Amino acid sequence: VEQYRDAVWQLWKEANAGFEEEKLIALDTLSSNSSGYWKLPENLEPNAVMPYCWGMKGAVETGAELPLFLYLHGSGPKEREWSTGLKICRNFDDAPSVYFIPQIPNEGDYYRWWQKAKQFAWEKLLRQALLLGEIDPNRVYVFGISEGGYGSQRLASFYADYWAAAGP
């Protein structure tokens, strides 16, 4: 079984290497400087650009697989909510770990973390993060505050096979 699992994993990596898509920025120390953005499909949400922070906390042993936390902010003004989320996540005592902290692309009717355009982003995140080989696929978590907490619960039902836990 292990031999076939490894063969399927290699084929999966090769198939994904051929995707022409925006990639995650290089994994670095979690800070406001470790940020990038993804353009989400126009047919799923108009004018949707998702800024994100992507980074590690703590010293990492060579070859160690780290937990990944997806943090979803609340529904206040998106700039303030996003910067507050980064501060909160940097203070959690969970190092070594990796965080993906997105900013909601649009306010108004599109201020929901479970909508199709954001699902596109989560599927891209999961695929790209797991392909790095540094993330423990059994320790991928989603959580948030307020609208982010609600979103984490909705996403728990959509991606139950991916999350180790989901919590508001």
Name these PLM-found stretches.
Residues 76-78, 146, 150:
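Gly/Ser/Thr-rich beta-alpha loop segments that engage phosphate groups in nucleotides
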Residues 1-66, 147:
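A domain-start/cap signature at the N-terminus of enzymes
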Residues 71, 167-168:
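A short, hydrophobic beta-strand element of the alpha/beta-hydrolase
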Residues 66-68, 72-131:
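Active-site machinery of serine-nucleophile hydrolases
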Residues 151-155:
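Hydrolases whose catalytic domains are alpha/beta-hydrolase-1, hotdog thioesterase
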Residues 59-64, 111-147, 157-162:
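Gly/Ser-rich "nucleophile elbow"/oxyanion-hole loop immediately N-terminal to the catalytic nucleophile
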Residues 150, 164-167:
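Accessory recognition modules or surfaces
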